[in-house]
């Protein structure tokens, strides 16, 4: 009997496997030429989440090597940017000296130490004509009250409660102020910003100048904010300019019984053996704006702060930055409320742009939607 297990020296099962492979390739070619199959495959590929990192992983080693070179260049750019911001800080210091005579005069007008001249107090409002018309109408209505109108108006010294009014107008600050803080803040006469000396680490100091009062003996309360303008070695690509990294307050020399940052509570204690009861008093922290001068310290020993402490510290940094960049340079506009209106309008404009963009996107999806023009 002939042996059929081999054909021309090739095992029969190998021949069968080759035939199956050939048939599989032909079937695959036929399937891949089917438009419906291709469309289904494309749809599945489109639904697969795509991330930049997943794309980078697919690149050849030679391309990845060049990308690493680009990252090296980016780090060098970050260090150049850090030097740029250091020079900006030097410029801020230079121009702060030019602003200061104007701020000193502002303080004199606020405190009433100096009365502005007619030329210095002349100001033309954008709504001057409307105000004049309203004044004319009012004068016609109150003709019968001329006698009362001629009475001398009160003329307080300077601009009373100037800085306290700013605290009330600005939400970020008013949220910190308690009712018992208010009479103290009415003694606030000036807020100044002082920059670090040339060659010293970047920092700025907020100075709160108070007139003599019944609450503490300090004439000036200070808050120092320390800054850093260098890329983080662990994450150099996160660098976006100088950042506040820590702050120091000052000791407030409170007069007896006037410290609003603590409150006294009474607590009864019962002796376990004798059963006698005694009342003890102790001081506990109290919410107050003046806790601003006793801030949390940023962790410098490598230990991370808890979430609440991190939030408190970040809020403190934000307030310090706001005093420096907004409140002190534009104080009169926060007193009148004009700067607050500008801030609100800017925020509303941003929201409006987002809503308009969302509407445009919806319109693109609904190609058949009916358009109803507004008349």
UniProtKB/Swiss-Prot annotation:
<feature type="modified residue" description="N-acetylalanine">
    <location>
        <position position="2"/>
    </location>
</feature>
<feature type="region of interest" description="Disordered">
    <location>
        <begin position="116"/>
        <end position="137"/>
    </location>
</feature>
<feature type="modified residue" description="N6-acetyllysine">
    <location>
        <position position="146"/>
    </location>
</feature>
<feature type="modified residue" description="Phosphoserine">
    <location>
        <position position="54"/>
    </location>
</feature>
<feature type="region of interest" description="Disordered">
    <location>
        <begin position="339"/>
        <end position="375"/>
    </location>
</feature>
<dbReference type="GO" id="GO:0003723">
    <property type="term" value="F:RNA binding"/>
</dbReference>
<comment type="subunit">
    <text>Interacts with core (H2A, CD2APH2B, H3, H4) and linker (H1) histones.</text>
</comment>
<dbReference type="GO" id="GO:0006334">
    <property type="term" value="P:nucleosome assembly"/>
</dbReference>
<dbReference type="InterPro" id="IPR002164">
    <property type="entry name" value="NAP_family"/>
</dbReference>
<comment type="subunit">
    <text>(Microbial infection) Interacts with Chikungunya virus non-structural protein 3 (via C-terminus).</text>
</comment>
<feature type="modified residue" description="Phosphoserine">
    <location>
        <position position="125"/>
    </location>
</feature>
<dbReference type="GO" id="GO:0043025">
    <property type="term" value="C:neuronal cell body"/>
</dbReference>
<keyword id="KW-0143">Chaperone</keyword>
<comment type="similarity">
    <text>Belongs to the nucleosome assembly protein (NAP) family.</text>
</comment>
<feature type="modified residue" description="Phosphothreonine">
    <location>
        <position position="58"/>
    </location>
</feature>
<comment type="function">
    <text>Acts as a histone chaperone in nucleosome assembly.</text>
</comment>
<feature type="modified residue" description="Phosphoserine">
    <location>
        <position position="5"/>
    </location>
</feature>
<keyword id="KW-0007">Acetylation</keyword>
<feature type="modified residue" description="Phosphoserine">
    <location>
        <position position="12"/>
    </location>
</feature>
<keyword id="KW-0539">Nucleus</keyword>
<dbReference type="GO" id="GO:0005634">
    <property type="term" value="C:nucleus"/>
</dbReference>
<dbReference type="GO" id="GO:0042393">
    <property type="term" value="F:histone binding"/>
</dbReference>
<protein>
    <recommendedName>
        <fullName>Nucleosome assembly protein 1-like 4</fullName>
    </recommendedName>
</protein>
<dbReference type="GO" id="GO:0030425">
    <property type="term" value="C:dendrite"/>
</dbReference>
<dbReference type="GO" id="GO:0005737">
    <property type="term" value="C:cytoplasm"/>
</dbReference>
<feature type="modified residue" description="Phosphoserine">
    <location>
        <position position="7"/>
    </location>
</feature>
<feature type="compositionally biased region" description="Basic and acidic residues">
    <location>
        <begin position="121"/>
        <end position="137"/>
    </location>
</feature>
<keyword id="KW-0963">Cytoplasm</keyword>
<dbReference type="GO" id="GO:0031491">
    <property type="term" value="F:nucleosome binding"/>
</dbReference>
<dbReference type="GO" id="GO:0051082">
    <property type="term" value="F:unfolded protein binding"/>
</dbReference>
<feature type="modified residue" description="Phosphoserine">
    <location>
        <position position="53"/>
    </location>
</feature>
<feature type="modified residue" description="Phosphoserine">
    <location>
        <position position="304"/>
    </location>
</feature>
<dbReference type="GO" id="GO:0003682">
    <property type="term" value="F:chromatin binding"/>
</dbReference>
<feature type="region of interest" description="Disordered">
    <location>
        <begin position="1"/>
        <end position="31"/>
    </location>
</feature>
<keyword id="KW-0597">Phosphoprotein</keyword>
<dbReference type="Pfam" id="PF00956">
    <property type="entry name" value="NAP"/>
</dbReference>
<feature type="compositionally biased region" description="Polar residues">
    <location>
        <begin position="20"/>
        <end position="31"/>
    </location>
</feature>
<dbReference type="GO" id="GO:0000785">
    <property type="term" value="C:chromatin"/>
</dbReference>
<dbReference type="InterPro" id="IPR037231">
    <property type="entry name" value="NAP-like_sf"/>
</dbReference>
<feature type="short sequence motif" description="Nuclear localization signal">
    <location>
        <begin position="265"/>
        <end position="271"/>
    </location>
</feature>
<feature type="modified residue" description="Phosphothreonine">
    <location>
        <position position="51"/>
    </location>
</feature>
<feature type="modified residue" description="N6-acetyllysine">
    <location>
        <position position="105"/>
    </location>
</feature>
């Amino acid at each position: 009997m002939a042996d059929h297990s081999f054909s021309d020296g090739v095992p029969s099962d190998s021949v069968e496997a080759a035939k199956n492979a050939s048939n599989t390739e032909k079937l695959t070619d036929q399937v891949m030429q089917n438009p419906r199959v291709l469309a289904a495959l494309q749809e599945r590929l489109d639904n697969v989440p795509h991330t930049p990192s997943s794309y980078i992983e697919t690149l050849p080693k030679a391309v990845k090597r060049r990308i690493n070179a680009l990252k090296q260049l980016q780090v060098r750019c970050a260090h150049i940017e850090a030097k740029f911001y250091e020079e900006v800080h030097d410029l801020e210091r230079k121009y702060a000296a030019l602003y200061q005579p104007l701020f000193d005069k502002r303080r004199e007008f606020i405190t009433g130490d100096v009365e502005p001249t007619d030329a210095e107090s002349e100001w033309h409002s954008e709504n001057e004509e409307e105000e004049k018309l309203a004044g004319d109408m009012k004068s016609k209505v109150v003709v019968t009250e001329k006698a009362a109108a001629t009475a001398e108006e009160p003329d307080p010294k300077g601009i009373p409660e100037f800085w306290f009014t700013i605290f009330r107008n600005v939400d970020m600050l008013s949220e910190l102020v308690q009712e018992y803080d208010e009479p103290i803040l009415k003694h606030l006469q000036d807020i100044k910003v002082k920059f670090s000396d040339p060659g010293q680490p970047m920092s700025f100091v907020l100075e709160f100048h108070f007139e003599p009062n019944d609450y503490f003996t300090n004439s000036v309360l200070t808050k120092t904010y320390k800054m850093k303008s260098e890329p983080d070695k662990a994450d150099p690509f996160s660098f976006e300019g100088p950042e506040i990294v820590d702050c120091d307050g000052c000791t407030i020399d409170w007069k007896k019984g006037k410290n609003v940052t603590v409150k006294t509570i009474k607590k009864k204690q019962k002796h376990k053996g004798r059963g006698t009861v005694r009342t003890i008093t102790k001081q506990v922290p109290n919410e107050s704006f003046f806790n601003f001068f006793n801030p949390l310290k940023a962790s410098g020993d490598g230990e991370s702060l808890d979430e609440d402490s991190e939030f408190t510290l970040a809020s403190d940094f934000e307030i310090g930055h706001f005093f420096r960049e907004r409140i002190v340079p534009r104080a009169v506009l926060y007193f009148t409320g004009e700067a607050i209106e500008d801030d609100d309008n800017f925020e509303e404009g941003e929201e409006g742009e987002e809503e308009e963009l969302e509407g445009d996107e919806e319109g693109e999806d609904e190609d058949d939607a009916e358009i109803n023009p507004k008349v």
